[in-house]
Amino acid sequence: MDLKESPSEGSLQPSSIQIFANTSTLHGIRHIFVYGPLTIRRVLWAVAFVGSLGLLLVESSERVSYYFSYQHVTKVDEVVAQSLVFPAVTLCNLNGFRFSRLTTNDLYHAGELLALLDVNLQIPDPHLADPTVLEALRQKANFKHYKPKQFSMLEFLHRVGHDLKDMMLYCKFKGQECGHQDFTTVFTKYGKCYMFNSGEDGKPLLTTVKGGTGNGLEIMLDIQQDEYLPIWGETEETTFEAGVKVQIHSQSEPPFIQELGFGVAPGFQTFVATQEQRLTYLPPPWGECRSSEMGLDFFPVYSITACRIDCETRYIVENCNCRMVHMPGDAPFCTPEQHKECAEPALGLLAEKDSNYCLCRTPCNLTRYNKELSMVKIPSKTSAKYLEKKFNKSEKYISENILVLDIFFEALNYETIEQKKAYEVAALLGDIGGQMGLFIGASLLTILELFDYIYELIKEKLLDLLGKEEEEGSHDENMSTCDTMPNHSETISHTVNVPLQTALGTLEEIAC
């Protein structure tokens, strides 16, 4: 190893790198930078140190790369609760319009929309209709000398939709009687619907402290198939089913029953055992969720269903200058003509468009309800006569129109599903620190030693550079003061046995 001569004493001293290697806590380098000539031992230590450093860099880069891949893991847990908030329950009759409530004015404006009349306001296929229904329709569709009146889609749906007061035969919540006043009217694509436990209008949310049947909502409904519209054509409003559509959801999200609801058939008692799930997703770059606090144009709380309805509303308003009755906002409601000619085709086009137009990301916090359905036939042979007498209906009518819906928590617990970061900064630092200790015996303080050595080295170089500049300036000044004096340097031949700087000073004095 190179040794440098001491400027003051002329002796050999170790270089700065040798001093650092001898005092540093970095393993191995003291065996590389030692006093004396280059040996095989020093070469082997150098190879071992460089190899260990290379392995450290490879492993550390792999850990850094894994960190920036932003992986996540999912944690599932089940939590027992003392009580649970009962979910909102939205139900809709699959028939959106009661035939008996249709008026001549309704048929004049909306007969084509309902597929009851053609473009000429004529019954298209009278041979497909029941004679009694056909006669009633002909009377309602007699437009001879008729003067049409003003028409409102909101008023039409509210008046013609099924009334829960007429549909409901009985209602119980946790064994206590409830009624139509405990339901809130909402409008969906099915028309006039009803929501239980909405929490709106200042009503407190209902809770339950037990699981199992009898501790939730039990309701008996008459779907009134006699009121279903006759079908001899197909439109977006046409339905071939009989029953109700039901959606179980949280109070913070609007119903999207046409896509997320399940059907309940007449002639059966349907049991719905549900379990609450609380999901937590990660935002970018670990996930794709959107904060629930980031509201939308028409909804204060973000959810996927709210985003879908919000997007559809904006699209219809932009293209048709109106909105459907179930859509929020202050734009005017679409007329039946706008419904048929613009709004319904626009929704069809929107469904066919690239999904990026209505890109609805998952909210970061979401509550949903798992469901398990089972059903039994009603009425039984032994109860048929009793129900006939109680509701003054025939057994056939009961089998075709009456259903019972029983919704309850399977158990008084909820499931949490949470996304967590698979690799955080603390884990990254721990892995890199462990590998530093394994491969080169270094720690954070060792890194500080390296920075301190680099700082001292730079400072020394700068001071040497500044010292040389000052020395050159001083030498030039002394030479200028001696220009007028004779040069005696040639006459001096003796040797001065003093340090180099002292000797130079003496020579300059003699020279001057």
Curated annotation (Swiss-Prot):
Outcome of substituting H326A: No effect on pH dependence and function
GO molecular function: ligand-gated sodium channel activity; monoatomic cation channel activity; monoatomic ion channel activity; monoatomic ion-gated channel activity; pH-gated sodium channel activity
Protein source organism: Rattus norvegicus
Superkingdom classification of source: Eukaryota
Protein name from the UniProt record: Acid-sensing ion channel 2
Modification type Phosphoserine: residues: S8, S11
Family statement: Belongs to the amiloride-sensitive sodium channel (TC 1.A.6) family. ASIC2 subfamily.
Phenotype for N478S: No effect on N-glycosylation
Pfam families the record matches: ASC
Family matches, as InterPro entries: ENaC (IPR001873), ENaC_chordates (IPR004724), ENaC_CS (IPR020903)
Regions that span the bilayer: 38-58, 428-448
UniProt GO BP: cellular response to acidic pH; cellular response to xenobiotic stimulus; detection of mechanical stimulus involved in sensory perception; establishment of localization in cell; monoatomic cation transport; monoatomic ion transmembrane transport; negative regulation of apoptotic process; phototransduction
Regions of this protein lying in the Extracellular compartment: 59-427
Regulation: induction: Up-regulation upon tissues inflammation is abolished by anti-inflammatory drugs.
Membrane topology: Multi-pass membrane protein
Keywords: Cell membrane, Disulfide bond, Glycoprotein, Ion channel, Ion transport, Membrane, Phosphoprotein, Sodium, Sodium channel, Sodium transport, Transmembrane, Transmembrane helix, Transport
Effect of G430V: Constitutive activation causing cell death. Activated at lower pH
GO CC list: dendritic spine; membrane; neuron projection; neuronal cell body; plasma membrane; postsynaptic density membrane; synapse
